[in-house]
Swiss-Prot record:
GO terms for molecular function: cAMP binding; cAMP-dependent protein kinase inhibitor activity; protein kinase A catalytic subunit binding. Keywords: cAMP, cAMP-binding, Nucleotide-binding, Phosphoprotein, Repeat. Belongs to the cAMP-dependent kinase regulatory chain family. It comes from Colletotrichum trifolii. This is cAMP-dependent protein kinase regulatory subunit.
């Protein structure tokens, strides 16, 4: 087959003016080059690709390399940053090592921390005897993960926990590298924690790695894998026979424990909108103060005495109360409702309480400790001192020593 002759195209509408050649016909005018059938261009590109492929095949035959053995990116000597593990792999195989050794993806179920995400989900309930409930409350009493829960959330946690007796010694409860499904609270006995530097449990007598700690009764473990959707970071085995654990499944843990933190912060942030320091000040400490508060439900403590220690400032979150200027006063001088606050005077002046606060309904307040109050709200002390109690008709001098 004879191919037509080629010459450079002198046409401003074609960008590849020196490299692109099309068949020449004496009968075509320069304008016709722009509307020449596209099949000639496709044929030219096809011939070019064929030539390059043939030359590459010939070059590969002349410089034949040994086959590259596949190396797992999850092995003991894998490099997560894509670098070569030794000098022999540096070269043509470096790109392959980089691609295979890239960091693996992290995925989990969607969990939007808001009040309307519960949908049709209900926490599981496992029946327990009164004796089991008593032991369980004692086991979680000092655990920091349960300290911020209200009564309703605590009841859900108590109902969802499952008792797991560990009858013998050296029983593996969790293994390093496995997927996390449960969070455990130790009621009785002790458990040893081992960490292998390779990241997973290895075979052999030394496969668990080095012992890094011991968890006694009242402690807990397994929360990191559930919070961060990561493999188990350690191996935990029973250190003595007759141990008892309480297990909480992953979904309940994330729904209750993690969302409760978000809801508590949202509640205190909403209540803080009425604070003078947070409403008028742009200071970063005042804006971050709601994250330091703790929600407290105190149905039994109905009175905050004027003689108590000045350690806490309370904010009304969901209740109604009345302020009494005297110890035996019968007439209230000020009423508090949702969003109001009290207790700042004693903290600003380091003085005794000037009044007694009596709750008329169930109390749910957000409290800020004295040290956090002085550290976070100290820069806005001037705004706090401008707060007046103008609606109080009696006992103003005794109640508000800041007024002059």
């Amino acid at each position: 087959m004879a191919f037509p002759t080629y010459r450079p195209v002198q046409c401003s509408k074609l960008t590849d003016h020196e490299l692109l050649r099309i068949p020449h016909s004496p009968s075509l005018e320069p304008l016709d080059y722009c509307i020449e059938p596209i099949s000639y261009l496709r044929r030219t590109v096809y011939d070019l690709h064929t030539t390059v492929a043939n030359r590459s095949s010939s070059r590969a035959l002349l410089h034949k390399q040994p086959p590259v053995m596949f190396k797992s990116p999850f092995g003991a000597n894998a490099n997560p940053f894509g670098g070569a593990s030794d000098g022999a792999t540096v070269g043509g195989n470096a790109m392959h090592q980089y691609n295979f050794s890239r960091r693996t993806s992290v995925s989990a179920e969607s969990l939007k921390p808001s009040a309307d995400t519960y949908d049709n989900w209900t926490p599981p309930v496992h029946d327990k005897t009164n004796e089991q409930l008593s032991r369980l409350k004692t086991a979680i009493a000092g655990n920091f993960l349960f300290s911020h829960l209200d009564d309703e959330q605590s009841a859900q946690i108590l109902g969802a926990l499952i008792e797991k007796p560990i009858p013998a010694k050296d029983i593996k409860v969790i293994s390093q590298g496995d997927a996390g499904e449960y969070f455990y609270v130790v009621e009785k006995g002790s458990f040893d924690v081992y960490v292998n530097e390779k990241g997973t449990l290895q075979p052999g007598p030394e496969g668990m790695g080095e012992k890094v700690g011991t968890i006694q009764a009242g402690g807990s473990f397994g929360e990191l894998a559930l919070m961060y959707n990561a493999p188990r970071a350690a191996t935990v085995i029973s250190a003595e026979p007759g141990c008892t654990l309480w297990a909480l499944d992953r979904l309940t843990f994330r729904r209750i424990l993690m969302e409760s933190t978000f809801l508590a912060a949202a509640c205190t942030r909403t209540s803080s909108e009425k604070f003078p320091c947070c409403r008028h000040s742009h200071h970063m400490s005042a804006q971050k103060s709601p994250t330091r508060w703790k929600l407290r439900s105190t149905p039994l403590v109905r009175r905050l005495s004027r003689r108590e220690t000045r350690v806490t400032r309370f904010t009304c979150s969901r209740w109604r109360g009345r302020c009494l200027p005297g110890e035996m006063a019968r007439e209230s001088v000020k009423h508090y409702s949702k969003g109001d606050f009290f207790g700042e005077l004693a903290l600003l002046n380091d003085a005794p309480r000037a009044a007694s606060i009596v709750a008329t309904t169930d109390v749910k307040v957000a409290s800020l400790g004295k040290s956090a109050f002085q550290r976070l709200l100290g820069p806005v002390e001037g705004i706090m001192r401008r707060t007046k109690y103008d609606d109080i008709k009696t006992g103003v001098e005794e109640m508000d020593p800041l007024q002059v």
